[in-house]
Amino acid sequence: MGEGLLDLRSQLGFYKFYHHNPKNVLIHSIFVPTILFSGSCMLHRVKIYQSISLTAVLSVLFSIFYCLLYLPTGLLAGVLLLLLNLALIDHRVDLTFKQELGLFTIGWIFQFVGHGVFEKRRPALIDNLVQSLVLAPYFIMFEFLFKLGFMPRLKATLEHDLEIKQRNLRMQRQ
């Protein structure tokens, strides 16, 4: 199995290793988009150059990374991020900073509860902050696509890889 930065299997496998409990995956499926949305709203207030926001710059960078991992889903993620940016630019989102911060905070609280209560382990961001933050929305998109029946072989491969990692971890603990 490839372990490179641009290896889809290893990137999704890294994330799945920390997110395999169904209740925690459900929590993440709700609150990763909440964090992405509210964080994007807050970062849209930060202008990098004239009217170009930090959200726009990060969206482009995320989209490029996602496309390099796997073009079809990368394009889908890019379109979703573009739509979010267009909504922000066109002032279709009418939240105060306090509301955005509240959603952002609630999202993170639920993330940590999910890990502590259901996974019973620390979150992935403790081991790799940037990888976790960048991959979280993409992983959730894959989880949604898997639920719809797309890419069954990739889903099975990731589940098989997870079983091997968990078995190795149990053997190390003995």
From Swiss-Prot:
Which residue windows are transmembrane per the record?
24-44, 64-84, 99-119, 132-152
Give an example GO biological process: fatty acid alpha-oxidation
- A Pfam family annotated for this chain is Mpo1-like
- Which GO terms fall under molecular function for this chain's record? fatty acid alpha-dioxygenase activity
Q: Which residues lie on this side of the membrane: Lumenal?
A: 45-63, 120-131
Query: What function does this protein fulfil?
Result: Dioxygenase that catalyzes the alpha-oxidation of 2-hydroxy fatty acids in an iron-dependent manner. Involved in metabolism of phytosphingosine and is required for proper endoplasmic reticulum stress response.
Quote the protein name from its UniProt record. Answer: 2-hydroxy-palmitic acid dioxygenase MPO1
